[in-house]
Design a protein with these regions (language model features):
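Active-site C-terminal subdomain of aminotransferase-like
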Residues: 1-61, 76, 147
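Short amphipathic alpha-helical segments
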Residues: 17, 81-85, 117-119
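Short, flexible, solvent-exposed loop/turn segments with mixed acidic/basic and small polar residues
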Residues: 39, 73-78, 110-113
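Short amphipathic beta-strand starts and helix->beta connectors
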Residues: 65-72, 103-108
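Conserved PLP-binding catalytic core of the aspartate aminotransferase-like
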Residues: 71-102
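Short amphipathic alpha-helices in soluble, non-transmembrane regions
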Residues: 96-105, 134-140
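Conserved PLP cofactor-binding pocket of PLP-dependent enzymes
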Residues: 105-123
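PLP-dependent enzyme catalytic core of the Aspartate aminotransferase-like
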Residues: 120-147
Length: 147
């Protein structure tokens, strides 16, 4: 493996020139990658996670679109992410209240990017259906209580 595109620790030319002491590969990161990959394969593979991602994001976007008097997503439907759903409340004070209350309910990291604010819900692979439903129930209740 002498291709310059390979990481240094897999590039035999670089390793030979450095007397095999070029650097230590990030062994813990590689090990965690192995564990995550095994978990994903065991859970159903890429097809399963793609389907779950699309299903969860579609449910959340539909909910947002159907409650446009209180919440809106400014991203055009064509460009919406399946991983990070971003939106704002029409009442700006609700953004901070939502973040505060969600944290109290154990839902963390929903604050939007520091440059744009709002809310960002990450639907990464580790977010299973039970977690998603917990969040969605919280979101529905929040809208009812903040009409």
């Amino acid at each position: 493996m002498t291709d310059e595109k390979n990481p240094s620790y897999l590039n035999l030319n670089k390793l030979t020139k450095a007397g095999s002491v070029l650097n230590t590969p990030p062994t813990f990161s590689i090990y965690v990658l192995k564990l995550v990959t095994e978990w994903m394969v065991k859970s159903g593979g890429l097809e399963y996670f793609e389907e779950k991602s699309k299903r969860q994001s579609n449910v959340l976007y539909d909910f947002i679109d159907n409650n446009s008097s209180q919440v809106n997503c400014k991203v055009e439907k064509t460009y919406r992410s399946n991983s990070n759903v971003v939106f704002n409340f029409t009442n700006e004070a609700d953004n901070e209240n939502f973040i505060k209350l969600s944290t109290e309910k154990g839902i963390i990291g929903v604050n939007g990017h520091r440059s744009v604010g709002g809310i960002r819900v990450s639907l990464f692979n580790s977010v299973d259906d039970e977690m998603f439903e917990y969040f969605l129930d919280f979101f529905k209740q929040f809208l009812v209580e903040n009409k």
